[in-house]
C-alpha cells in the first residue's frame, strides 16, 4: 500500500528507522512516533497533509481536532498470522486463537471509531487489491484524489511479495 502512495507522489511521513528486510523488501514506511501515540499524539499536528502509516489498534488514539482521510487496509487474518509466524521465526499455533480474537476486535473497534467520529475512510481488502487491482485502484484513486495513471499504479503491485497467501 505504501508503495502506491509513493508512486502517487504522496508526501509520506517516515523516519526510515525501520528499513527494508527479507520480510518486507520494499521497506516499512513507518514513523517511530506512532508507537507512542497512546501517550502522545501531538506529533500529528506537524504532519498535516502527509500520509502516515498507523496500525489498526492505534487508530483510536489519533487527535480528533484534525481532519483525516483513512485508507484502511484489511488483510486476511490467516495470512496475517502466517506472516507473523514467519517473521517471529517460531510456531504460533498456541497463540493463534488469542491473536485471532484480538485482531478481529481491533479491526471492528477501529471501524466503529472512524464511523462514530465521522472520519472519512475507505476499506481496501489486501487480497482484492492483488486479484482485482483495477477496481481497487480506481476506488483508491477516487478517494485520495490521485491523478497518477492507473497503469502506473498497477505496475507497483508486486505479486511476488504476496508470500503468505491463503488458498481461496
Functional labels for PLM-detected ranges:
Residues 1-50, 158-168:
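PAPS-dependent sulfotransferase catalytic core
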Amino acid at each position: 500500500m505504501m508503495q502506491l502512495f509513493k508512486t502517487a507522489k504522496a508526501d509520506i511521513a517516515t523516519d526510515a528507522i525501520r528499513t527494508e528486510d527479507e520480510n518486507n523488501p520494499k521497506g516499512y514506511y513507518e514513523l517511530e512516533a506512532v508507537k507512542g501515540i497512546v501517550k502522545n499524539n501531538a506529533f500529528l499536528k506537524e504532519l498535516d497533509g502527509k500520509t502516515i502509516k498507523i496500525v489498526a489498534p492505534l487508530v483510536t488514539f489519533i487527535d480528533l481536532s484534525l481532519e483525516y482521510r483513512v485508507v484502511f487496509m484489511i488483510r486476511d487474518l490467516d495470512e496475517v498470522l502466517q506472516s507473523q509466524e514467519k517473521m517471529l521465526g517460531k510456531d504460533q499455533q498456541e497463540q493463534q486463537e488469542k491473536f485471532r480474537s484480538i485482531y478481529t476486535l481491533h479491526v471492528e473497534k477501529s471501524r466503529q471509531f472512524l464511523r462514530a467520529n465521522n472520519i472519512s475512510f475507505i476499506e481496501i481488502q489486501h487480497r482484492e487489491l492483488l486479484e482485482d487491482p483495477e477496481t481497487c485502484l480506481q476506488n483508491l484513486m477516487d478517494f485520495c484524489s490521485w491523478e497518477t495513471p492507473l497503469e502506473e499504479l498497477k505496475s507497483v503491485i508486486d505479486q511476488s511479495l504476496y508470500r503468505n497467501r491463503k488458498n481461496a
